């Protein structure tokens, strides 16, 4: 097996937008990583229904197709 062909696998501190932080291991190459959603705030794990909107896509969709009548 060839040596030194695999990326470095180091500890990374992950910070969610909700404020939750945890340490994991990754090949990302950074010491810190920011994410938008984690298991502490994801609707599937919390049981709360909410729309997870990235960059206003839901609002854009509603603006574009909200006035249409049902078929």
UniProtKB/Swiss-Prot annotation:
SUPFAM superfamilies: L28p-like. The keyword Zinc applies. One of its GO terms (cellular component) is ribonucleoprotein complex. Keywords: Metal-binding, Ribonucleoprotein, Ribosomal protein, RNA-binding, rRNA-binding, Zinc. Binds 1 zinc ion per subunit. Zn(2+) binds at residues 16, 18, 38, 41. GO terms for biological process: translation. Its cofactor is Zn(2+). The keyword Iron does not apply. GO terms for molecular function: metal ion binding; rRNA binding; structural constituent of ribosome. It holds the Pfam family Ribosomal_L31. InterPro entries: Ribosomal_bL28/bL31-like_sf (IPR034704), Ribosomal_bL31 (IPR002150), Ribosomal_bL31_A (IPR027491), Ribosomal_bL31_sf (IPR042105). Belongs to the bacterial ribosomal protein bL31 family. Type A subfamily. Binds the 23S rRNA. HAMAP family: Ribosomal_bL31_1. NCBIfam families: L31 (TIGR00105), PRK00019.1 (NF000612), PRK00528.1 (NF001809). Part of the 50S ribosomal subunit. This is Large ribosomal subunit protein bL31. It comes from Francisella tularensis subsp. novicida (strain U112). The gene is rpmE.
């Amino acid at each position: 097996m060839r040596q030194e062909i695999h990326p470095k696998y180091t500890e990374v501190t992950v910070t969610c937008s909700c404020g939750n932080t945890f340490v994991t291991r990754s090949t990302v190459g950074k010491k810190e990583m920011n994410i938008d959603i984690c298991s502490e705030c994801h609707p599937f794990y919390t049981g709360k229904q909410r729309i997870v909107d990235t960059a206003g896509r839901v609002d854009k969709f509603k603006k574009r197709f909200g006035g249409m009548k049902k078929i």
